[in-house]
A protein has these predicted regions:
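Short, flexible/disordered intra-domain loops and linkers
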Residues: 46-55, 112
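Structural beta-alpha unit
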Residues: 1, 71-101
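Active-site phosphate/pyrophosphate- and oxyanion-stabilizing loops and adjacent acidic/basic residues
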Residues: 24, 89, 121
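Gly/Ser-rich helix-loop-strand patches that form or flank binding pockets
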Residues: 97-137
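Small/aliphatic-rich secondary-structure junction motif
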Residues: 1-50, 78, 126
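Generic structural signal for helix capping and beta-alpha/helix-loop junctions
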Residues: 44, 87, 110-112
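Short, surface-exposed alpha-helical segments at coil->helix boundaries
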Residues: 53-64
Length: 137
């Protein structure tokens, strides 16, 4: 399979640098278009009514800084910043425009894994394109 359009679902820049780096390597190997997708959930930037936690609302400039820091090969990366109420559904919708979706996978505890799928598993179960899963420690 030859990939022409690759998308990375980018969540948290500290942990996803490894995922971004892998996506750049694959895109370069196939000379493919690379798009970094980040979904700001609708409540991002505002305190949660439950616990007061404020989820960070990323800007295109912040994501561009992350790409510049990780992208030592200066491979062209398009940044797509979207807002949605559900991250999984938004990633699935945007992934319809690509051949390969690159995702990070965080280990879940036994209890969490036995009661539900991780976000990346939920996404992969509904994808219409190939997926590359990068383990994040």
């Amino acid at each position: 399979m030859e990939y022409k359009k690759i998308m990375i679902a980018f969540e948290e820049h500290d942990q996803d640098n490894k995922v971004l780096s892998a996506a750049i390597d694959v895109a370069q190997r196939y000379n493919a278009e690379l798009t970094l997708l980040h979904i700001n959930e609708r409540g991002a930037g505002y305190p949660s009514p439950v616990d007061g936690h404020i989820e960070h609302r990323y800007t295109e400039e912040e994501l561009s800084e992350v790409v510049t820091k990780v992208n030592t090969k200066n491979y062209p990366v398009t940044i797509l910043l979207a807002k949605a109420s559900g991250v999984g559904d938004a990633v699935i919708e945007h992934s319809k425009a690509c051949d390969l979706l690159v995702l990070g996978h965080r280990h879940m505890s036994f209890l969490a894994a036995s009661t539900s799928d991780s976000m990346d598993e939920e996404i992969v179960n509904q994808l219409q394109c190939h997926a590359l899963i990068i383990p994040i420690t």
